[in-house]
Amino acid sequence: MTRPKYVASCSGGKDSVATLLLAAQHNEPLDEAVFSEVMFDKDTSGEVPEHRDFIYDRLKPFCEKALGIKFTILHADKIYDEVFHHVITRGPHKGEVRGFAWAGMCAVNRDCKIPPVRKYNAALSPDTVSYVGIAQDEPKRLARLDGLKKVSLLAKYGMTEADAYKLCQEHGLLSPIYTHCRRNGCWFCPNASDLELLHMVTKHPDMFDRLIEWENEDNIFHRRMTRRETPSEVKARLLSKSQTGFSSARNK
């Protein structure tokens, strides 16, 4: 009887990378790591550039060469450009262009992040076991796992989020995003913190200015990037502040 396939969901964040390392350290079965990449447009990743490079240049080769497992990168049929420029077909704003995603009900996650994962999972054998990066100190999230088909190696080996951070750091596999934020997400995320937004404004101004170009297009329904501000307002506010006004991102 053949054993089931073991797959690790991998965002490239500390918890999912620590899961890969634990699997290797404890000889846990693992066949494949899967990463779903959102695309801003056909040529530009939705990942923060430093994190995108970490995935492609560091993590993927590590999985394939050091761990000997397949590293699969999934993409949705839809890109953020299409989500933003979707023309509303019903209601009082019919005929207008949708615009930026809303905080708390992000269409990017719904249309660009989740669909390729669902499609991938649907093709797996029913007995496939999925490793998820949920730490020991996340009891509410752990409670949603069945412990059979969805398993947390972090919980199994008693690792907290801080432990996961340290493990990745020790192996040189900590994403550079943790120098300016606590989590990884799209660089145009409506839930991004000021530190994350400041990073894009100052380190990748050409990319952030793409959002301002979109903001200034005609017939846009939702021009706010965050709950309160448009991209141009975000940029103006952050640049007017002294950078000493921003506290460094703290490691969990």
Indicate residue ranges for each PLM-predicted region.
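Nucleotide-activated chemistry modules centered on ATP-dependent adenylation/adenylyltransferase
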Residues: 1-252
